[in-house]
């Protein structure tokens, strides 16, 4: 029997939360439903928990688990799992978030009516214990996104606003990811890439004004900022900046390459934004791994204010940078 929707739960190193996330996936009211539990080669017990829960499941959904042989990153993971999916619509769930029972139903019904290239929804914020922190949160629209794509007259707009898709609450037609070429290496910022491609194709992103997931806020999340001012906290924040910067370079390269492969009509101003973003990643990545001379050489790569704002306080070493940060944040 064919299924119209696949709910894919993707996880990496989430053994403390994945069981609860899977339980919420299995509790979906939509039927017939395929559920794929997919692990990105976690070194912890994430995949073992997936296998255990598939083995013990007795219910109406078609459920199976898969594992990447090596860690491939979010974009390749979504490409692979979409190629394996049977549903026309692929609903994405993270291994530490909770999908509410009617999530798949609500997304599928809205998508069947609109034909959007991506779906998303409001969400509730929960802590690591599952305690409610905030209800009915709409992921904010980015003023920067509006500036980046301002010249794209064919971009789909909702009351004049260009929508983006928050990856943690997203759903896509299976073909969106399945038809992409494999990226040359691991990419993590899948929602930035997806939003850019959908906008440049002139397709629609639809957000449902109701909470369909419990989005878990964790200290280690890429979307949660650490605010401590101790040396250890500052070093940790710098590591996260470096991590994001490396990914930014790879994602922008893949995006620019895909725009070229598809022959999309992109305004020169938009392409300038893309290239400046890639350059910013090159300016900020691996900064503390290079020597003092190489740090000063990066001054010649400054293209935008954000490049200078990153470089200037860091040029004279980490100790002075940490002292300045503590001084001006008090």
Predicted features, each with a name:
Residues 156-160, 166, 187-188, 192-193, ...:
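C-terminal subregions of glycosyltransferases and related glycan-biosynthesis enzymes
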Residues 1-232, 327:
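Nucleotide-sugar donor-binding/catalytic module of glycosyltransferases
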């Amino acid at each position: 029997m064919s299924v119209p929707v696949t709910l894919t739960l993707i996880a990496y190193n989430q053994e403390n939360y994945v069981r609860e996330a899977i339980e919420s996936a299995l509790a979906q009211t939509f039927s017939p439903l395929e559920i794929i539990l997919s692990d990105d080669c976690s070194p912890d017990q994430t995949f073992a928990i997936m296998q255990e829960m598939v083995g013990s499941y007795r219910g109406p959904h078609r459920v199976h688990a898969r594992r990447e042989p090596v860690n491939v990153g979010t974009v390749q993971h979504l490409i692979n799992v979409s190629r394996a999916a049977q549903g026309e619509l692929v609903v994405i769930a993270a291994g530490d978030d909770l999908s509410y029972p009617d999530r798949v139903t609500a997304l599928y019904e809205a998508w069947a009516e609109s034909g959007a290239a991506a779906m998303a929804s409001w969400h509730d914020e929960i802590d690591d214990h599952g305690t409610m922190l905030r209800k009915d949160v709409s992921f904010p629209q980015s003023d920067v996104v509006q500036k980046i794509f301002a010249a794209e007259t064919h971009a789909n707009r909702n009351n004049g606003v260009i929508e983006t898709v928050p990856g943690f609450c997203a759903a896509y037609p299976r073909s969106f990811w399945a038809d992409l070429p494999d990226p040359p290496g691991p990419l993590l910022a899948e929602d930035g890439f997806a939003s850019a491609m959908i906008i440049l194709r002139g397709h629609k992103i639809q957000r449902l004004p109701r909470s369909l997931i419990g989005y878990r806020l964790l200290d280690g999340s890429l979307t949660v900022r650490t605010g401590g001012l101790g040396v250890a906290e500052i070093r940790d924040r710098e590591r996260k900046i470096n991590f994001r910067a490396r990914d930014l370079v790879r994602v922008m390269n893949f995006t620019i390459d895909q725009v070229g492969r598809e022959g999309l009509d992109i305004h020169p101003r938009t392409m300038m934004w893309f290239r400046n973003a890639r350059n910013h990643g090159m300016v900020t990545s691996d900064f503390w791994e290079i020597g003092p001379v190489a740090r000063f050489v990066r001054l010649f790569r400054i293209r935008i204010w954000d490049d200078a704002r990153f470089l200037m306080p860091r040029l004279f070493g980490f100790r002075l940078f940490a002292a300045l940060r503590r001084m001006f944040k008090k």
